[in-house]
Amino acid sequence: AGFKAGVKDYKLTYYTPDYETKDTDILAAFRVTPQPGVPPEEAGAAVAAESSTGTWTTVWTDGLTSLDRYKGRCYHIETVVGEENQYIAYVAYPLDLFEEGSVTNMFTSIVGNVFGFKALRALRLEDLRIPPSYSKTFQGPPHGIQVERDKLNKYGRPLLGCTIKPKLGLSAKNYGRAVYECLRGGLDFTKDDENVNSQPFMRWRDRFLFCTEAIYKAQTETGEIKGHYLNATAGTCEEMMKRAIFARELGVPIIMHDYLTGGFTANTSLAHYCRDNGLLLHIHRAMHAVIDRQKNHGMHFRVLAKALRMSGGDHIHGGTVVGKLEGEREMTLGFVDLLRDDFIEKDRSRGIFFTQDWVSMPGVIPVASGGIHVWHMPALTEIFGDDSVLQFGGGTLGHPWGNAPGAVANRVALEACVQARNEGRDLAREGNEIIREASKWSPELAAACEVWKEIKFDF
């Protein structure tokens, strides 16, 4: 029998409301906004088709394979409450559609061409369920939370960081000086800004050398292990690896990568190198807002966060809940759990559409950074808990007495909050009081409290 040529509705093949999802399926929740006149079933089925085996017309070669085995299926559709003409379409993809250990391939399918599809006004990937049968094909984070604490010998509190500012324009020697002052004052880490790569005013090798000198000097004087996130992001993968190898030769504990601008392929290679060579890997999410900021189109950050845990990174920026960058508390805590925990229950109030079981993949430490200062410390300690990095750029370097006192102020504020919490005090209610008490015996903290007493980024 010849095949039946012509165009037929996607929903005849790809909308299967009776389908029972398999444990090995990758599940996706899409927020679909169909064009006027396109029924939601057709829109959901179109997404399933275009992101798996479908094309716009029936083709003769369909007969050479088993669509039933390989097609994506839209198995459930629900209306989004409070939005006009928006639906959540749930799609199940058979495991065989994806190359093992490749976030790149997973995204090329799931969020590839389908996002330019005419029948849809907008499309957003809200969440993915990664089955253990797929996640087990990834190395994941180079080290994870416990190994990092053991390497650094730091327990029972959040870690403190600072991005060196001005982010562009300092010479390598002045940059190293700022690193030393911050680490000497009491921070655990300092950070290259995400756009510091290797520019004419400061070439990467000079920066690496001066920062390493700063790290070793601060370590010797404080008796604590210190780190600086040396940004290895580069224009080619070869150049990126060259920078990572040089960092390893210098004996530093941690390097950094911009995983979205650098790309998942480069990031995964770097993560493998970091595990093999004992380097921690700090991940910055520059470019994420291009993808995740629109509520009806793109991808939610929780998907980018899951992808990073698979590709590999030990720290990732994840919003602050309290600073200058967007982030709603419950949603933020939702993806913070997805980064850190082994097993996360489905919870729609926190934006988690699927129960996610990471089995034993190491966790990633969330980094809170952006417009935060000493008065935020109690809230940050309570919201993020011990397994986090709190990063104060302006909140350290903007101290009226300089960088080292700025670092002292942050460390004193943090230790005061941790001690108060361990004594059973309520950080949410008594936060300001705790900071005030601590500032009585720390002039550096008192000066910081004075400068930032009124600032809030409310819009």
Curated annotation (Swiss-Prot):
EC number(s) from the headed UniProt entry: 4.1.1.39
Protein's name according to its UniProt entry: Ribulose bisphosphate carboxylase large chain
One example GO MF annotation: magnesium ion binding
CDD domains: RuBisCO_large_I
UniProt modification remark: The disulfide bond which can form in the large chain dimeric partners within the hexadecamer appears to be associated with oxidative stress and protein turnover.
Similarity field: Belongs to the RuBisCO large chain family. Type I subfamily.
UniProt-listed PROSITE patterns: RUBISCO_LARGE (PS00157)
Role description: RuBisCO catalyzes two reactions: the carboxylation of D-ribulose 1,5-bisphosphate, the primary event in carbon dioxide fixation, as well as the oxidative fragmentation of the pentose substrate in the photorespiration process. Both reactions occur simultaneously and in competition at the same active site.
Known catalytic reactions: 2 (2R)-3-phosphoglycerate + 2 H(+) = D-ribulose 1,5-bisphosphate + CO2 + H2O; D-ribulose 1,5-bisphosphate + O2 = 2-phosphoglycolate + (2R)-3-phosphoglycerate + 2 H(+)
One Pfam short name: RuBisCO_large
Quaternary structure and interacting proteins, as annotated: Heterohexadecamer of 8 large chains and 8 small chains; disulfide-linked. The disulfide link is formed within the large subunit homodimers.
Keyword Chloroplast: yes
N6,N6,N6-trimethyllysine sites (modified residues): 4
Positions annotated as active site in the UniProt record: 165, 284
Modified residues (N6-carboxylysine): 191
GO BP, one annotated term: reductive pentose-phosphate cycle
Gene: rbcL
Binding site for Mg(2+): 191, 193-194
Localization annotation: Plastid, Chloroplast
InterPro entries with a match to the protein in the record: RuBisCO, RuBisCo_large_chain_AS, RuBisCO_lsu_C, RuBisCO_lsu_C_sf, RuBisCO_lsu_fd_N, RuBisCO_lsu_N_sf, RuBisCO_lsuI
Binding residues for substrate: 113, 163, 167, 285, 317, 369
